Amino acid sequence: MALKILFWGTPGYAVPTLDALHDAGHRIVAVVTQPDRRRGRGKQLIPSAVKTRALELDLPVYTPEKIRRDLSCQQQLADLGADLSVVVAFGQILPPEVLFQPPLGCWNGHGSLLPRWRGAGPIQWSILEGDVQTGVGVMAMEEGLDTGPVLIERALAIGLLENAHQLGERLSQLTAELMVEALPLIESAGPGPEDERHRRLGLRPQRQDVTYARMINKSDYQLDWTGSALAIHRKVMA
């Protein structure tokens, strides 16, 4: 059955999932993304990749500066009557009023094998730290940062000569595939109390060996020429 989905995402990484949900016949009731930002030498306002794609698909778009504080936007989104929210790299922390509003929950496609690399930069940190594999998980969202139990996940190997852009392309496609795969499972659990829905779905709680992937900054890319060739290679790839 086609589900009514509220989609949250911002960068190009999230576009394949938006496309996949649309192509699968689900009804995207609206897309929520970050506001246009000034970029480039001319400081022109540039829309996010997700906004650009949503407009091409003729979907309603909301661009709250801070969804936590925008009570009007929260109410407008609630009034759309979505069955669930799908979140892929949105870029803001969602408040409880948003997380727990849809009857089938709020679900996130995350580019790592949780609990390794919770946070904003899992792709870059998996390369910087020399991980041999990473993956994608679809998890039920909680108030904590990437702390929710996992519904489904899939691993993939990281190539020695694979850079962050290339790895991100593969992970974004895998995220789209897994989210489409997850939706019938989520629907089968039906609405009701969150703990009961999660029990019916058999979600996997995250283990205790947690690592965090903070946002990469310019200093992280400074090369230390006294370091090993492998460490330098990883920084270049990330």
Regions found by a protein language model. Give the residues of each.
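One-carbon transfer enzymes
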Residues: 1-238
